[in-house]
């Protein structure tokens, strides 16, 4: 069973309080999501493999550490996942970015795929699927299904907030996927919105309704 990591870092929790706040405007909301995305990526990549390399400083030669093993790819779920991407790239500028487009059927609440664009060597990379919210779990499950069908094996999921129902369903559907969350909220309401949540992340990021 994949592990669930809930971050308690003070900076993440501080910024998340403003992301949740209904009075936070679009510009500040975008900036905060971007910043938290970067901070979360720092934690998500904590266990990447390192190798010894010989370098020369201005003073002497030494053995230093550099990343080795599988390369990274981040896959935001459109459209809201895009809001976390720039912060991630600030931290990991060489990472590849794929995209999975999904929308939620308002009646069935099931995720419907409409777009997929991934790096050609996706099966050789460590994948981090990115979406601000894990509500019912349907979008995350379908996105990971799509990645696995195309050969991806090493997959993690990263989100700002999650409902317990979504975490449970994602774990049941993909036992091999670790889940990284800035905050685990109370529940889903009758309309499948996370409570207390932050509203519709996509609408708040892009100024739409």
Curated annotation (Swiss-Prot):
Keywords: Allosteric enzyme, Glycosyltransferase, GTP-binding, Magnesium, Nucleotide-binding, Transferase
Co-factor binding details: Binds 1 Mg(2+) ion per subunit. The magnesium is bound as Mg-PRPP.
Activity-regulation annotation: Allosterically activated by GTP.
UniProt binding sites for uracil: 194, 199-201
GO BP terms, alphabetized: UMP salvage; uracil salvage
Protein source organism: Staphylococcus saprophyticus subsp. saprophyticus (strain ATCC 15305 / DSM 20229 / NCIMB 8711 / NCTC 7292 / S-41)
Gene designation: upp
NCBIfam families per record: PRK00129.1, upp
Entry similarity comment: Belongs to the UPRTase family.
Enzyme Commission (EC) number: 2.4.2.9
Native organism taxonomy: Bacteria, Bacillati, Bacillota, Bacilli, Bacillales
Transferase keyword on record: yes
Role, per record: Catalyzes the conversion of uracil and 5-phospho-alpha-D-ribose 1-diphosphate (PRPP) to UMP and diphosphate.
Catalyzed reactions: UMP + diphosphate = 5-phospho-alpha-D-ribose 1-diphosphate + uracil
GO terms assigned for molecular function: GTP binding; magnesium ion binding; uracil phosphoribosyltransferase activity
UniProt keyword annotation of GTP-binding present: yes
Obligatory cofactor(s): Mg(2+)
Protein name, entry field: Uracil phosphoribosyltransferase
InterPro entries: PRibTrfase_dom (IPR000836), PRTase-like (IPR029057), Upp_B (IPR034332), UPRTase/APRTase (IPR050054), Ura_phspho_trans (IPR005765)
Source domain of life: Bacteria
Annotated binding of 5-phospho-alpha-D-ribose 1-diphosphate, by residue: 79, 104, 131-139, 200
Pathway annotation: Pyrimidine metabolism; UMP biosynthesis via salvage pathway; UMP from uracil: step 1/1
Top class in the EC scheme: transferase
């Amino acid at each position: 069973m994949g592990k669930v990591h809930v971050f308690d870092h003070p900076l993440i929790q501080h910024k998340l309080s403003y992301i949740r706040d209904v009075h936070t405007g679009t510009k500040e909301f975008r900036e905060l999501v971007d910043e938290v995305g970067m901070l979360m990526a720092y934690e998500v990549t904590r266990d990447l493999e390192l190798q010894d390399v010989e370098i020369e400083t201005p003073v002497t030669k030494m053995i230093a550490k550099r990343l080795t093993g599988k390369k990274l790819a981040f896959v935001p779920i459109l459209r809201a996942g895009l809001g976390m991407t720039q912060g991630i790239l600030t931290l990991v500028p060489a990472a590849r970015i794929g995209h999975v487009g999904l929308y939620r059927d308002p009646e069935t609440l099931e995720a419907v795929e409409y777009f997929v664009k991934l790096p050609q060597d996706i099966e050789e990379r460590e994948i981090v699927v990115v979406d601000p919210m894990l509500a019912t779990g349907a979008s995350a499950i379908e996105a990971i299904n799509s990645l696995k069908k195309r050969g991806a094996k090493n997959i993690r999921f990263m989100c700002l907030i999650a409902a317990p129902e979504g975490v449970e369903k994602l774990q049941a559907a993909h036992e091999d996927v670790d889940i990284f969350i800035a905050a685990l909220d109370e529940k889903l309401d009758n309309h499948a919105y996370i409570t207390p949540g932050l509203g519709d992340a996509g609408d708040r990021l892009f100024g739409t309704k």
